[in-house]
Swiss-Prot record:
UniProt xrefs under HAMAP family: AcpS (MF_00101)
GO cellular component, one term: cytoplasm
Family indicated by similarity: Belongs to the P-Pant transferase superfamily. AcpS family.
Role according to the record: Transfers the 4'-phosphopantetheine moiety from coenzyme A to a Ser of acyl-carrier-protein.
Substrates-to-products reaction catalysed: apo-[ACP] + CoA = holo-[ACP] + adenosine 3',5'-bisphosphate + H(+)
Listed InterPro entries: 4-PPantetheinyl_Trfase_dom, 4-PPantetheinyl_Trfase_dom_sf, ACPS, Ppantetheine-prot_Trfase_dom
Cellular compartments annotated: Cytoplasm
Alphabetic keyword roster: Cytoplasm, Fatty acid biosynthesis, Fatty acid metabolism, Lipid biosynthesis, Lipid metabolism, Magnesium, Metal-binding, Transferase
Pfam family, one: ACPS
Protein name: Holo-[acyl-carrier-protein] synthase
A single BP term in Gene Ontology: fatty acid biosynthetic process
Length: 137
């Protein structure tokens, strides 16, 4: 069985949240590893990288059939949700993005019999996209 999730986010939306809420937003949504991956060599924030990781978290949640806690009006009130840190985008030894699940997200993946996840990230200056495919078998 295959499960798929895709998400598209405007980079400006993430930039606005970072500018408005600062580290409070960044720490709430992104793990320390994700934060480090989204800093340019100069230490400047790469908003498109943050947006791509946001999209990956959303796409993964869609593939798992769950929502993310903290999305306010976008979340369905009675639907179980995973925390932002429970879906983490890390890099493998070759630099490719991979997903690391924990907590409720990992429990849901196990309940669906998911044995592998693949994530693809892409972005322009304005938009970030993520696609997640989950294999159960």
């Amino acid at each position: 069985m295959l499960y798929h999730g895709v998400d598209l986010v405007e980079v400006a939306r993430i930039r606005h949240a970072v500018v408005r809420y600062g580290q409070r937003f960044v720490q709430r949504v992104y793990t320390a590893t994700e934060q480090a991956d989204c800093l340019a060599g100069s230490g400047d924030v790469r908003y498109e990288a943050l947006a791509a990781r946001w999209a990956a978290k959303e796409a993964c949640a869609k593939a798992l059939g769950i929502g993310l806690r903290g999305l306010g009006a976008l979340a369905v009130a009675d639907r179980p949700r995973a925390g932002f840190h429970e879906i983490e985008v890390v890099r493998d030894n070759d630099g490719r993005p991979v997903l690391r699940l924990s907590g409720f997200a990992a429990e849901q993946a196990a309940a669906l019999g998911i044995c592998a996840l693949a994530v693809s990230l892409s972005h322009t200056d304005e938009l970030a996209l993520a696609s997640v495919v989950a294999w159960a078998g």
